[in-house]
């Protein structure tokens, strides 16, 4: 019997020396707990995804140097399989990819073997074919007379029996089975979307049972730009039963035992999963906000508090991620702000224990109005004047953030961002859009969940009609359909890629569907200039959304 440790790590992209130290620490801890073999996530040495850092030769050189340092620092009694980038030295032909996405085996202070990723994803947020060469097949190493097959992330996602179709021509897992492996490990950096860990476990359990081989899956954890990695590393036996699992959204070192006589895995820990999707989503957003600030060098956040539900939720997330003393809320009431909204904002801040400052914007609005009289003359009050209020607020928030070194959190939700119900250089200002991938209906669900044990979000915030309060008596439904209808349409259009006619056939009014489709298309220029938003659904308006701005395509049925 030998013991395998799964190091579920939270690397910082480009912090190569720091990441190497983290791996050494994990190895020493694993050795102290009796482990013989340590597994890290995909590209653990540089962090995933490194993107165009890979085009910098010095980045790759530093990775090579740190890999050698890592080998020298490894305890001699433990072997390690570490995810990193390695040069493709045979890539001499001009234009051929010169890098591998690799797993490197280190034993007794020596680099013994290299394993390269076969399947390179190019969908959604992935663009690996831009940088890496694709290996012809997966390979194995022998450890204590056990053939251990090595795969990297996507290599396990081509089980045609599970999906009902093949996505790639080769199946690395099947290649390893044909080579007679006894155990398969997978080094992964699989980004989070709500409920995705269930899909991973279902897929890998199915594959283990299909091929009668135990499988180990070790995932990255932490936030890197718009992506959140949820961890949840796990192992299954040859019958497809999960026998060990690390917790979601935190670093972990889990141990497994491999029985040489039975050829089976046994686990020492089976972490429970969140009871509801809302709890899981909350944990993801908290991790994403905290890591984004810390990895960008910020310790404090600022946001505008309007008394509405979106800013209330973002404030609660920020306080949980950073601590109440590190979050500042700014109230900026205008002549159109209701008294109850001001009181709701103050009540929220009191419930969270965070500090606030109030800056009435009426005098600034008057100055703008006076300056624009020669141009606007007698034109009636309209959208330009409404947006000026938002831009005044955005300007004030950026000034305060700039003055004190805080990061400004944008508070817009996915529903608003989709249809452009937001103001460029106004409420869209910020360094991070915390809930930009959370639909409005889910914002309400999160706030109700937060209030399950004690009142954090003031009850009136949950019951009053949503409003931007940029003119007298304004409510969101003056411009948009009810949010349950809007989110139903957007979910089908954005995440399920349905055509307007398919959405209409699902029971939505034709006129409403066509209006929403048009708004989504016309608002691309706003999304292109938005702050980075944390991805929590299968399709976000982030790095995986690549729509043109100047375009005239209209789907059939529209």
Swiss-Prot record:
It comes from the Bacteria. Deamido-NAD(+) binds at residues 387, 416, 526. Pfam families: CN_hydrolase, NAD_synthase. CDD domains: GAT_Gln-NAD-synth, NAD_synthase. Its EC number is 6.3.5.1. Catalyzes the ATP-dependent amidation of deamido-NAD to form NAD. Uses L-glutamine as a nitrogen source. This is Glutamine-dependent NAD(+) synthetase. The keyword ATP-binding applies. It comes from Synechocystis sp. (strain ATCC 27184 / PCC 6803 / Kazusa). Residues 2-262 form the CN hydrolase domain. ATP binds at residues 304-311, 411. The active site is at residues 42, 117, 153. L-glutamine binds at residues 123, 190, 196. In the C-terminal section; belongs to the NAD synthetase family. GO terms for cellular component: cytoplasm.
């Amino acid at each position: 019997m030998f013991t395998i440790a799964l190091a579920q790590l939270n690397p910082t992209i480009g912090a190569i020396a720091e990441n190497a130290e983290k791996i050494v620490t994990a190895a020493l801890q694993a050795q102290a707990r009796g482990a013989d073999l340590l597994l890290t996530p995909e590209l653990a040495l540089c962090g995933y995804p490194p993107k165009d850092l890979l085009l910098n030769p010095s980045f790759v050189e530093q990775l090579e140097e740190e890999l050698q340092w890592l080998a020298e620092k490894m305890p001699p009694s433990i072997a390690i399989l570490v995810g990193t980038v390695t040069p493709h030295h045979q890539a001499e032909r001009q234009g051929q990819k010169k890098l591998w996405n690799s797993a490197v085996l280190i034993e007794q202070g020596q680099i013994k073997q290299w394993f390269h990723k076969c399947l390179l994803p190019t969908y959604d947020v992935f663009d690996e074919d831009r940088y890496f060469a694709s290996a012809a097949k997966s390979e194995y190493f022998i450890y204590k007379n056990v053939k251990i097959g090595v795969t990297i992330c996507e290599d396990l996602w081509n089980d045609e029996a599970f999906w009902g179709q093949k996505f790639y021509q080769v199946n690395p897992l099947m290649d390893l089975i044909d080579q007679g492996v006894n155990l398969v490990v997978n080094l992964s950096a699989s980004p989070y979307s709500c409920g995705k860990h269930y899909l991973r476990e279902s897929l890998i359990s199915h594959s283990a049972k299909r091929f009668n081989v135990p499988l180990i899956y070790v995932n990255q954890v932490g936030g890197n730009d718009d992506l959140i990695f949820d961890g949840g590393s796990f192992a299954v036996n040859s019958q497809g039963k999960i026998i060990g699992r690390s917790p979601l959204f935190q670093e972990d070192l889990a141990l497994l035992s491999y029985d040489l006589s039975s050829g089976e895995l046994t686990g020492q820990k089976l972490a429970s999963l969140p009871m509801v999707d809302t709890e899981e989503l909350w944990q993801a957003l908290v991790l994403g906000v905290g890591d984004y600030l810390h990895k960008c060098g910020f310790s404090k956040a600022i946001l505008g508090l309007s008394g509405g539900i979106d800013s209330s939720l973002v404030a609660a997330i920020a306080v949980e991620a950073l601590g109440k003393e590190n979050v500042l809320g700014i109230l900026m009431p205008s002549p159109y702000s209701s008294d109850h909204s001001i009181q709701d904002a103050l009540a929220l801040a009191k419930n969270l224990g965070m500090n606030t400052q109030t800056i009435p914007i009426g005098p600034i609005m008057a100055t703008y109005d006076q300056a624009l009289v020669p141009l606007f003359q007698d034109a009636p009050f309209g959208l330009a004047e409404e947006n000026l209020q938002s831009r005044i607020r955005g300007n004030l928030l950026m000034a305060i953030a700039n003055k004190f070194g805080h990061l400004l959190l944008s508070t817009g939700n996915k529903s608003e961002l989709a249809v452009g119900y937001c103001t460029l250089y106004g409420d869209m200002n910020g360094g991070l859009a915390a809930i930009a991938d959370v639909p409005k209906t889910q914002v309400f669900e999160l706030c109700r969940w937060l209030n399950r044990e004690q009142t954090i979000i003031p009850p009136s915030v949950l019951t009053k009609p949503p409003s931007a309060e940029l003119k007298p008596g304004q409510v969101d439904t003056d411009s948009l359909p009810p949010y349950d209808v809007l989110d139903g349409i957007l979910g089908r259009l954005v995440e399920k890629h349905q055509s307007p006619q398919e959405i209409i056939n699902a029971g939505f009014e034709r006129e409403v569907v066509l209006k929403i489709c048009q708004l989504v298309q016309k608002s691309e220029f706003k999304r292109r200039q938005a702050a980075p938003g944390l991805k929590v659904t299968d399709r976000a308006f982030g790095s995986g959304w690549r729509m043109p701005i100047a375009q005239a395509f209209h789907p059939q049925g529209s």
